[in-house]
């Protein structure tokens, strides 16, 4: 009986762990808000904003071939860690005051931010 209770508890906990990491497919839908200015995936190019391919782990303001970064973002000096990206999705102006991104609403739902992060991290064509 104890084994069944333990197994049931593990099964109930599993979805919580999976959702904390984000769902890339759901994140693709969230990314539609970003796609006005940014591209990802095979053949992505810089547009109004830089391509976000392989952004995780990259230094802020350094996408090769993109020259329209704000002085604030070029001077930020941080690496795009998961925590930095999640904070940026929520309120970019709090992460780098004076940046030029025009997305004042941010992504308010924490699950949407997790999903967006999972999607963007999946966009690193080899």
Model features per residue range: what roles?
Residues 119:
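Histidine-centered phosphotransfer motif of kinases
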């Amino acid at each position: 009986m104890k084994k069944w209770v333990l197994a049931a508890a593990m099964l109930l906990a599993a979805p919580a762990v999976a959702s904390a990491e984000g769902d890339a497919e759901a994140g693709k839908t969230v990314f539609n808000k970003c796609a006005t200015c940014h591209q990802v995936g095979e053949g992505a190019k810089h547009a109004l904003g830089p391509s976000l391919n392989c952004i995780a782990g990259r230094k802020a303001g350094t996408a090769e071939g993109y020259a329209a970064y704000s002085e604030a973002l070029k001077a930020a000096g941080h690496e795009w860690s998961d925590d930095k990206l999640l904070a940026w999705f929520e309120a970019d102006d709090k992460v780098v005051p004076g940046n030029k991104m025009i997305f004042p609403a941010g992504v308010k739902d924490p699950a949407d931010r997790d999903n967006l992060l999972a999607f963007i991290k999946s966009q690193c064509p080899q």
